[in-house]
Amino acid sequence: MANAASGMAVHDDCKLRFLELKAKRTHRFIVYKIEEKQKQVVVEKVGQPIQTYEEFAACLPADECRYAIYDFDFVTAENCQKSKIFFIAWCPDIAKVRSKMIYASSKDRFKRELDGIQVELQATDPTEMDLDVFRSRAN
């Protein structure tokens, strides 16, 4: 079904990969992109569980918008191992205005398709989504 605001549909693979990350932890991260010609959100890249945050961040283009899911592992003050599922709306300042508008207008509908997101981040440059930001938002 297409999003009324932007006309973007969500490919079934987007939800499938998210469920694999959430339930089976078979992925560390998922990067999604909007295919304007097909008018839908698709999976661009899936990260293996052993991949690092740095490898994830390197997958986000410096000049194009993306959505991403990151499974963030951390240790609480009580020394408990936990994880939180982050949704990142990556919209660099230097991205094309049209792209920013399409990603912004499609975001809420896309997020509703992914049941289980625990934290949302919006980032326009890498400092807005570095590991310290993840740590502070996870607790």
Curated annotation (Swiss-Prot):
Assembly information from the UniProt record: Interacts with the 14-3-3-like protein GRF6/AFT1.
Outcome (variant: R135A): Reduces binding affinity to F-actin and actin-depolimerizing activity
Residue stretches spanning the membrane: none
Effect of K82A: Reduces binding affinity to F-actin and actin-depolimerizing activity
Classification via SMART domains: ADF
Alphabetized UniProt keyword annotations: Actin-binding, Cytoplasm, Cytoskeleton, Phosphoprotein
Assigned protein family: Belongs to the actin-binding proteins ADF family.
Residues found modified as Phosphoserine: S6
GO molecular function: actin binding
Gene3D superfamilies in the record: Severin (3.40.20.10)
Its biological purpose: Actin-depolymerizing protein. Stimulates F-actin depolymerization. Involved in plant development, cell organ expansion and flowering by controlling breakdown of thick actin cables. Severs actin filaments or bundles and promotes actin cytoskeleton disassembly. Binds monomeric actin (G-actin) with a marked preference for the ADP-loaded form and inhibits the rate of nucleotide exchange on G-actin.
Tissue-by-tissue expression: Expressed in vascular tissues of all organs.
Pfam families in the record: Cofilin_ADF (PF00241)
Protein name as catalogued: Actin-depolymerizing factor 1
Claim: Cytoplasm is one of the keywords in the record: yes
Gene Ontology BP term (one): actin filament depolymerization
